[in-house]
Structure formats: C-alpha cells, structure tokens
C-alpha cells in the first residue's frame, strides 16, 4: 500500500487483467465488497485505521485479477467486528469462484471456508484432508491445533 496515494489511486495502481477475465475486478466491485473503502476513496491510505488497511490490501490484490488469492493471516490483530467483516468478504469471494489459499489460526472460519486443509510443521505437510476428516482426527487436533 502506498500511504501517500488515496485509496482510489492505490486500487488503480495495481489494476491489471493479464488473464483476460471476462469480469475483471474494478473499483466498483472492490467498493461493493468493501463499502468502507468507497467511503474513503479520496482519503490517503496512510490515514486508514482499524481493518481498513487490510481491506485495501485485499482490494489491491484483487485488482490484479489473480487466479489464486493468497491471504496470510488476513485478520490477525484486528477487532472482532472487523475480522467478521473480512471473513464475510472472503466468503463472498469463495461464492464467486475465486480460488483462495488461506493461512490462519481461526479454525472455526477455516472449517467453514476451506474445501481442503493442510497442517504444516517446519515446512512439511503433516496432515491433509477435508474439514470432516479433521474433526474426526482428535490426535491431530490435539497435537497441532491445540483445541
């Protein structure tokens, strides 16, 4: 994010449709997904607060029209209300068919959103499967997730 550019300028700066998608991400679509950004379109990115910088970061990533959106702890350190907003947006992206790689510790959200789960330890896959298989595997949950 460029702090001396406005929200709008930050979105324009990353806009690209290299894959030639028929419905590329536009500012309007980003503003639909994150209405707060529409309210702050003319505001400098460096003055955003709460979860707004994270929303802008996701919006900027979407403006590149990625085949795979990678989100690494996208809600870490955010207030619960803002976290919920971002999870709802991720849900909407999934419903629209966006491929997403989520890295997070929030198992409740991951179970709801992920089609498939991987547990990594020191860079190696130690478990993989769907949410139902994970819920049945008490040993894995206890050892790696700590629930």
Residue ranges and their predicted role:
Residues 65:
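Conserved catalytic motifs of ABC-family nucleotide-binding domains
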Residues 7-25, 33-38, 129, 147:
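ABC-type ATPase nucleotide-binding domains, specifically the catalytic core motifs of the NBD
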Residues 44-48:
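Conserved ABC ATPase signature
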Residues 61-62:
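ABC ATPase C-loop
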Residues 69-73:
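Catalytic Walker B motif of ABC-type/P-loop ATPase nucleotide-binding domains
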């Amino acid at each position: 994010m460029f702090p001396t550019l406005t929200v709008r300028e930050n979105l324009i700066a990353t806009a690209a449709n290299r894959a030639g998608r028929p419905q590329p991400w536009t500012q309007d679509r980003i503003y639909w997904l994150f209405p707060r950004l529409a309210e702050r379109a003319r505001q400098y990115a460096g003055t955003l607060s709460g979860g707004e910088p994270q929303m802008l970061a996701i919006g900027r990533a979407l403006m590149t029209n990625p085949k795979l959106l990678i989100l690494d702890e996208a809600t870490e350190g955010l207030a619960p209300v803002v976290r919920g907003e971002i999870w709802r947006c991720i849900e909407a992206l999934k419903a629209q068919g966006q491929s997403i790689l989520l890295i997070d510790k929030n198992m409740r959200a991951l179970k709801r959103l992920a089609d498939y789960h991987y547990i990594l330890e020191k860079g190696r896959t130690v478990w993989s499967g769907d949410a139902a298989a994970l819920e049945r595997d008490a040993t894995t949950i206890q050892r790696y997730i700590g629930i």
